[in-house]
């Protein structure tokens, strides 16, 4: 048991560090060869930070641990909203851009709805089993390309170009990329094997491990980023990062993962997909129930932006605790 837990923890840490080094090395190489900061942010950084979930998804599906493959994605999406944004908004009101409210959050909701639709062949098309096939993966990637086009368009419009990517020597950058990839591969293997062993030793389902420990572990970068942003009074970036990550998880990770190896769905996971949909709806409602106002002159106040307030954050955390309680009850 101790060995399995150590494998799981070590695997998650290696995934996080491997993704960090992969992004650092790849960004440096891209910068050195004249790639713009905008394109680095859209491609290298965005894809690199999604590598932990991608590696866990691929390894678990190849090893036949389908519940971990899907549970990691669904559980990560739930944790990103209810846990990560819940904690961040309790620390400080989290501002939300109008484009995020009306475009990205609905797109995140669409992603989960599409996932549930495609993962229920046995109910919709009366197939013997429900499976995410390679054709489903191609459809996910088609949605993902539309999302990338939207992000590129919005960033150019808002002039949100990230600066500060460090340019290192080519050998050093290649070293970072190589070591990062190695850590990701090893971390993915250790995480999945540790999760499978823990589930077997404790007599609990692999879905439970995937939806909780593995999902929270792979969501740690989003949690740390969002909490630090809230502490540094830059909480407005938290929602965009979380919502973008949720869209990436479904359209990019499930797309690539199912093309490499189709994934079967346990019907019990439909309840978790429903919770992921509910969490996204709760987020959409939360950003409309709180507003920050700015006083102009003496009496007139103008609405400044949508926010997720502390009360909303508490509600989100309570919902997440209730969900964990449900998972324990379900086993």
What are these regions (language model features)?
Residues 1-331:
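Hydrophobic alpha-helical segments, chiefly the membrane-spanning helices
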